[in-house]
């Protein structure tokens, strides 16, 4: 009997030891990522950033492993993620495309991370540019953290301005400066155009105006600031005399200005990619023009990451989310191996990043001071469920209104009624 107890004890102890020994490897987190750049530019280093972050994370937390499915392209990522969600197999932590955030938040796919941010002593929202952090909010709660951001700048065709005997504007230029130069360019030659791809929403941002309320229940097209912004866009559009400027004309060097993201600038300004695009003329970038030196902003695009609301390991998932979006080493590698910039103020303003950008841009007007200024006052797209539909409705009607002989103010009021009806259906 005693021998039986001894053998049984050994077996139980062995099983217990095996369970304990294996415990550190029992938690596996799945990460959802896509290959390449989020910004539509060439990039082959996206996994280098992720793999480095995972390696550091697993060293910090030896009881947790991280896996991800490679080879998913950005164009396929939304479908891949939605299929996972439908099957109840969504990753614990995953990237969120800008167009998907409102939907994922509204259907409850993302975990509310307010309490994690509040109670984590190693985390502070003050570390982020507030404008970029806001990209992850929905209904006044935080559902995602910014992983990488991409502010909008203004492309300037320096060669064309020189041909027209126009001086390069400064970074503190205004909408009046922008319009004046576009007008001079259009008058100098019938083959030249002042701008390409500058939209009514760019003008809204430049005036610091608000098209919708935060809840997404009201549209403000008839408010004075919005009307001034749209009227400026209408006046600017009239310079083209009905001609729709094309991307081909822009790439041939026939256009003075066009909004351009930092990612495109960082990709095509330095060698070797410089010879692939915009190589037939000299160009640079400036801050987007605003209504005045103290008023207005520009759009910033943000790649977000969030936690699944159904994750069985939310504490570990939060730590992984922090490793990707809040760890300074990871964030520094994003600026090094990707084309956007870190949403963390300390990283974006670090000497390492300053030196990196100086090496890339040379004698350009782009500087960390300019980027810091752009990010401090940047604006994200609105975060409510019907935003995309409401914006499409305005887009569709805006060009018709601009070219119509109908009363412009009455047309705006009528469009506002239509949008408000849609928002409250």
Positions of predicted regions on the chain:
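Conserved N-terminal structural module of periplasmic/extracytoplasmic solute-binding proteins
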Residues: 1-103, 107, 292-295, 316, ...
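Glycine-centered hinge/linker elements that transmit conformational signals in sensory
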Residues: 182, 216-244, 288
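Short helix-initiation/N-cap motifs at beta->coil->alpha
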Residues: 70-80, 173-179, 241-252
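Long, aromatic- and glycine/proline-rich binding clefts that accommodate carbohydrate-like moieties
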Residues: 286, 336-400
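Paired acidic/hydrophobic, glycine-rich loop segments that form the ligand-binding mouth/hinge
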Residues: 92-95, 256-261, 266-267
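Extracytoplasmic/periplasmic substrate-recognition and gating elements
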Residues: 65, 238, 275-343, 376-379, ...
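Extracytoplasmic/periplasmic solute-binding protein
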Residues: 139-147, 152, 176-219, 225-226, ...
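Hinge/lid segment of periplasmic solute-binding proteins
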Residues: 98-151, 280-289
């Amino acid at each position: 009997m005693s021998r039986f107890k001894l053998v049984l004890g050994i077996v139980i102890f062995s099983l217990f030891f095996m369970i304990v020994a294996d415990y550190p490897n029992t938690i596996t987190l799945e990460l959802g990522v896509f290959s390449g750049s989020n910004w539509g530019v060439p990039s082959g280093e996206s996994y280098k950033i992720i793999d480095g972050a995972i390696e550091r994370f697993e060293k910090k937390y030896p009881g947790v492993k991280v896996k991800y499915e490679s080879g998913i392209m950005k164009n396929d990522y939304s479908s891949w993620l939605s299929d996972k969600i439908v099957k109840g197999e969504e990753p614990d932590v995953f990237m969120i495309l800008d167009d998907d955030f409102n939907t994922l938040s509204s259907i409850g796919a993302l975990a509310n991370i307010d309490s994690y941010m509040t109670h984590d002593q190693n985390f502070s929202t003050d570390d982020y540019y507030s404008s970029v952090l806001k990209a992850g909010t929905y209904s006044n709660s935080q559902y995602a953290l910014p992983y990488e951001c991409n502010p909008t700048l203004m492309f300037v065709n320096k060669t064309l301005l020189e041909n027209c005997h126009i001086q390069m504007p400064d970074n503190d230029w205004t909408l009046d400066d922008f319009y004046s130069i576009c007008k001079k360019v259009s008058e100098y030659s019938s083959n030249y155009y002042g701008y390409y791809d500058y939209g009514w929403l760019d003008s809204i941002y430049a005036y610091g105006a608000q098209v919708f309320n935060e809840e997404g229940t009201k549209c403000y097209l008839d408010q004075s600031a919005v009307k001034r912004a749209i009227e400026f866009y209408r006046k600017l559009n009239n310079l083209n005399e009905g001609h729709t400027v094309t991307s081909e004309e822009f790439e041939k060097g026939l256009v003075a200005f066009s909004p351009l993201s930092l990612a495109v600038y960082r990709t095509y300004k330095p060698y070797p990619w410089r010879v692939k695009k915009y190589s037939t003329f000299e160009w640079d970038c400036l801050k987007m023009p605003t209504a005045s030196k103290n008023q207005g902003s520009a759009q910033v695009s943000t790649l977000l990451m969030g936690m699944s609301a159904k994750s069985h390991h939310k504490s570990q998932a939060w730590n992984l989310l922090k490793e990707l979006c809040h760890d300074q080493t990871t964030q520094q590698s994003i600026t090094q191996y990707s084309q956007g910039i870190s949403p963390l103020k300390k990283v974006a303003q670090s000497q390492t990043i300053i030196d990196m950008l100086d090496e890339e841009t040379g004698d350009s007007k782009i500087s960390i001071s300019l980027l810091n200024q752009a990010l401090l006052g940047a604006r994200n797209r609105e975060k409510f469920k019907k935003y995309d539909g409401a914006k499409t409705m305005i887009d569709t009607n805006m060009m018709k209104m601009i070219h119509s002989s109908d009363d412009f103010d009455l047309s705006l009021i009528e469009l506002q009624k239509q949008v408000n009806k849609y928002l409250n259906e």
